[in-house]
C-alpha cells in the first residue's frame, strides 16, 4: 500500500512539475495545445490559467476568439457562474459577428439561471434570470435554445410563486393580518397563475376578519365592512363547491353579526 501511495505521489509531483514548466517556458502554441487538452479532459483549473495568459498572447489574432470562448466555459465548468456569465456576455460584445454570439448570450442567461437562489432566500436573482432569458428569446425568437429558455423560465416562475405564497402564509400565521392581506392581494393580482390561488384568497378574507376583530372599537366597523368586500371578491371568483366556500360563509356570518352588534352601540 505504501509503495502504491509513493508511486502516486511521484506521478503527481511529476505532473505538477511538467505543468509549472509549461507555464514558465512553454511556447504559445504548446500552451494552447495543452489548454485545449486540459479543457477536453474537464481539468478546468489547469486549463483556466493557460487560457487567461493566452488571451494576452493572442490579442488581435483570430485564435483569440476560440480561446475566449473556452475561457468563458472554463468558469462555467468550475461553477463560477458570476464570472462565467460576465465573460459570456463580454464575448458576445467583443465578437459581435461571431457564429458563437448567440450561444454566448444564451449561456450568459443560463449563468443567471444557475445563480438564482433557493426559494427561502431573496428572489431578486430569480427575477433577473427570468428577464435575461426573456431578453434572449426576444433577440433570437427562432433560436434552438428558445424551448430550453421557456422551460427554465417556467421553473423560475414556479419558484417565485412558491416564495410569494409562503410569504403570505407566514404573515398570516404570525398574526400580521394587515400585511397578510396585502401580500395575498398582491399575489393573486400579480400572478394570475398562482398556485393555490383559492387558498390565498381565503386567507385574505380570514386576515381581513381577524384584522377587524383585533382592531380598536372605532376602527372595527370600517374594517368589518372591508371584510365583507373581500368575501364578495372570493364569491365572485370561486364556485360554491370550493373547499373554502363554507369557511368564507362562516366569516361572512360572523362579520355581519359583529357589524350588527357595533351598530347597536
Predicted regions and their residues:
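TPR-repeat structural position
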Residues: 44, 81, 126, 177, ...
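TPR repeat positional signature
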Residues: 31, 68, 105, 112, ...
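Extended amphipathic alpha-helical interaction segments
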Residues: 108, 127-210
Amino acid at each position: 500500500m505504501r509503495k502504491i501511495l509513493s508511486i502516486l505521489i511521484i506521478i503527481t509531483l511529476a505532473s505538477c512539475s511538467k505543468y509549472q514548466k509549461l507555464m514558465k517556458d512553454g511556447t504559445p502554441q504548446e500552451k494552447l495545445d495543452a489548454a485545449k487538452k486540459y479543457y477536453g479532459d474537464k481539468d478546468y483549473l489547469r486549463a483556466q490559467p493557460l487560457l487567461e495568459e493566452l488571451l494576452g498572447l493572442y490579442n488581435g489574432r483570430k485564435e483569440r476568439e476560440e480561446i475566449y470562448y473556452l475561457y468563458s466555459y472554463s468558469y462555467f465548468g468550475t461553477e463560477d457562474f458570476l464570472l462565467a456569465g460576465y465573460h459570456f456576455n463580454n464575448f458576445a460584445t467583443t465578437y459581435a459577428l461571431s457564429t458563437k454570439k448567440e450561444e454566448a448570450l444564451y449561456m450568459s442567461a443560463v449563468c443567471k439561471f444557475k445563480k438564482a437562489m433557493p426559494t427561502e432566500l431573496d428572489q431578486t436573482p430569480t427575477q433577473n434570470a427570468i428577464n435575461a432569458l426573456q431578453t434572449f428569446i426576444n433577440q433570437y425568437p427562432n433560436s434552438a435554445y428558445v424551448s430550453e429558455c421557456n422551460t427554465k423560465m417556467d421553473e423560475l416562475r414556479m419558484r417565485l410563486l412558491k416564495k410569494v405564497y409562503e410569504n403570505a402564509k407566514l404573515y398570516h400565521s404570525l398574526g400580521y393580518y394587515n400585511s397578510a392581506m396585502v401580500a395575498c392581494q398582491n399575489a393573486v393580482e400579480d400572478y394570475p397563475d398562482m398556485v393555490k390561488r383559492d387558498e390565498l384568497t381565503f386567507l385574505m378574507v380570514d386576515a381581513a376578519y381577524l384584522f377587524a376583530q383585533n382592531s380598536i372599537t372605532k376602527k372595527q366597523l370600517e374594517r368589518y365592512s372591508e371584510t365583507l368586500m373581500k368575501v364578495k371578491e372570493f364569491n365572485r371568483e370561486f364556485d360554491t363547491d370550493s373547499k373554502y366556500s363554507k369557511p368564507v360563509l362562516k366569516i361572512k356570518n360572523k362579520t355581519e353579526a359583529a357589524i350588527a352588534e357595533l351598530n347597536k352601540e
